[in-house]
């Protein structure tokens, strides 16, 4: 999965917008692209190093996902109770990555719509 294909997938979900809200904090060292639904984040990643994504996750599914996939672990700068990171190009198939992103989108959309 490449960065543009992933971005297009995220933007294809209803009501999704994107932004780079953390530029002032990174001081040019990196750029985090964030995807929002209803004004709330559901996915983000470092544009300069598209090797992992961070997404919202149902807390009840986290343990099983982390046990099943080595590429799923602690989030990059997120609450470990609600977020996971997925390291791309490892043991999580692209279809599963898209499914996890869709689940993240639904979790956030349901809460804030």
Give, region by region, the residue ranges found by the protein language model:
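Charge-dense, helix-prone N-terminal extensions
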Residues: 1-113
């Amino acid at each position: 999965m490449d960065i543009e294909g992933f971005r297009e997938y995220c933007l294809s979900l209803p009501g999704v917008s994107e932004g780079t809200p953390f530029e002032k904090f990174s001081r040019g060292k990196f750029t985090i692209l964030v995807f929002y639904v209803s004004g709330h984040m559901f996915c983000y990643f470092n544009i300069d190093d598209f090797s992992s994504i961070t997404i919202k996750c149902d807390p009840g599914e986290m343990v099983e996902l982390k046990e099943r996939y080595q590429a799923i672990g602690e989030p990059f700068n997120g609450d470990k109770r609600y977020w996971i990171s997925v390291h791309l190009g490892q043991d999580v198939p692209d279809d599963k990555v898209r499914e996890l992103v869709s689940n993240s989108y639904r979790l956030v959309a349901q809460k804030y719509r």
